[in-house]
């Protein structure tokens, strides 16, 4: 039986009729909204988790921490639930109530912080990284920072799923 993670990727290409007609060439859109968590961030989150598993950065029952406005956190939570990991999301208070509600309903632990610029130590990304360091200093051995904005390996490695 397939797992929900198996349905990430393989999203259809949809021909965009009007732009194709006015340009004289075929123009297609990739329907990433058809991924299980509803966005292209499903691929990103899966790539992060597969990379972490391959490098033994996370163990069964471990914790994944990420700072996000929503879509990556939703995708990470879905994947982590399927793989048996706990998810802690640090989210700025400017994120939508809907995304906060979705994350809570999916089982993520949500920490909402004041919206701060990246240069501020209180920025949600910095807070998420510090949270990982705090958990590790308290003896948690299998906790990782997803760090979605450092995808240096994912974009040059094999795609997470066929395109």
Regions found by a protein language model. Give the residues of each.
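Positively charged, low-complexity intrinsically disordered leader regions
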Residues: 1-62
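Conserved beta-strand scaffold positions in the cores of enzyme catalytic domains, especially
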Residues: 13, 27, 110-112, 143-145
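Short, small-residue-enriched loops and turns at beta-alpha junctions
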Residues: 37-38, 117-121, 152-155
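Conserved beta-loop-alpha segment that forms the PLP phosphate-binding cup at the N-terminus of a helix
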Residues: 42-50, 64-85
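Active-site-proximal loop->helix
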Residues: 72-134
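Short glycine/proline- and acidic residue-enriched helix-loop micro-motifs
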Residues: 144-153
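Single conserved hydrophobic/aromatic residue that forms the stacking wall/gate
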Residues: 154-163
